[in-house]
Amino acid sequence: MDQLKQSLLDAPIIEKDGYHYFVHPISDGVPMLRPELLREIVIKIIRKAELEDVDKIVTPAAMGIHISTAVSLMTDIPLVVVRKRQYGLDGEVSLSQVTGYSENEMYVNDVYEGDRVLVLDDVLSTGGTLAALTGALEDIGADICDIVCVIKKEGGENKLADDGYHAKTLINVDVVDGEVVVVDDYGDD
């Protein structure tokens, strides 16, 4: 069994405001992230993502950063982090992130009209973060070459799909009766 699948099956589940979360090194930073798990994930992303002609990797803070940094190192594609803090730099674009559990403002810097981007994130759950991000990238005039998330949590509204985008995933899971259940070992293409 691969490490990503096993690590999800072993993940503890917590409940917050009626929403069930798995606690995982990729999505939460705890338990500790082992290098062999990160390496496996990065290799799977590189194999699955459409990387030809990509100018930049774009990832939302905070839990996409470690994944995207590793992919950037392996592909030599520069990394742009969409931040939760406004800096007021020239060209900064704001977006409203609405997820199943929070609402925040985020800020895109260093993405320009005509840039060809790969969007990477840790988990696709409600699609709120990625829907807001793809909308901002469209407004900028960037070309979204591909969207890849490590984990898809099934069972929720997918605002990203509602906006006409499809995210590739490495594995699809659900939380049933307090446990992670693997719905698709290989995720979505």
UniProtKB/Swiss-Prot annotation:
Q: Does the keyword Transferase apply?
A: yes
Q: What is its EC number?
A: 2.4.2.-
Annotated protein name in UniProt: HGPRTase-like protein
Name a Pfam family for this protein: Pribosyltran
**Which family is this sequence assigned to?**
Belongs to the purine/pyrimidine phosphoribosyltransferase family. Archaeal HPRT subfamily.
Q: Which GO terms describe its molecular function?
A: transferase activity
Report the top EC class in one word: transferase
Q: Which UniProt keywords apply?
A: Purine salvage, Transferase
Q: From what organism does this protein derive? A: Halomicrobium mukohataei (strain ATCC 700874 / DSM 12286 / JCM 9738 / NCIMB 13541) (Haloarcula mukohataei)
Any keyword Glycosyltransferase? Answer: no
